[in-house]
Amino acid sequence: MYFAIIGDIINSRNINTDSTLQIRNEVQINLSKILEEINIKYADVIAANFLITLGDEFQGLLNHPKYVFEIIETIKLNIYPIKLRFGIGIGSIYTKINRDMAIGADGPAYYNARKMVEQIKVLEKGKMNGSVNIMIKEEVELHPHEINLMNSNLQLCSSIENNWTWKQREIIKEIMLEKKSQVEAAETLGISQSSVQRRLKAAGFYDYIQGVETISTIVSQIWG
């Protein structure tokens, strides 16, 4: 069982014009750096390294679900203000896996991840515009209720995240990625601990993190 992650830049056409060529290059350089760091940090669970497959898309393959959402959060928080949509595909891989060439792997895990990216694009054109940025699909639908529950929960988490301000994101990045306490985050950012607490509460951070951790636990219990 494998866990494919496909990420896609939202509104990538807006950074594909000649006037924004420099911005596009900077985005690709930054994204490449983030993915390289992920490949090193999470090497134990990576079956095929994360890499950019198209100018506005990247993918990677995991052999264990433990860090699926931690990896996604790392990418999202580090690439902001560029926004991304993610498809998570759970399933088998038919081809031989080359760790350094994820683009050559093929199978239901990637098909499902791709389907979810496309599904998010469809939802963005309707009433769900902006409120969904991650969806999950499994190869054989043995857990339809759990999948629906997780996707609904991810939708709620996305709605919370979309309202975060720059200052709130700064703190959340310190807490989630750097694993700092509120006191440590306050020292890093040069603010008081009470300010950190207020911003986290205003951001709905505790509801968000509980939702993400619940989904991560369910995924690990079923497929871990």
Kindly give the residue locations of the regions a language model identified.
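Short alpha-helical "packing" element that flanks the helix-turn-helix/winged-helix DNA-binding module
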Residues: 168-175
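DNA-contacting interfaces and partner/effector-binding or oligomerization modules
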Residues: 1-125
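Flexible coil/turn residues that form the inter-helical turn or adjacent wing/linker of helix-turn-helix
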Residues: 178
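Key DNA-contacting residues within the recognition helix of helix-turn-helix
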Residues: 197, 201-202
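Short, Lys/Arg-enriched C-terminal cap helix and immediately downstream tail that follows
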Residues: 204-220
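Short alpha-helical "recognition helix" segments of helix-turn-helix
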Residues: 181-189, 196
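Linker/hinge segments immediately adjacent to helix-turn-helix/homeobox DNA-binding domains
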Residues: 111-163, 219-224
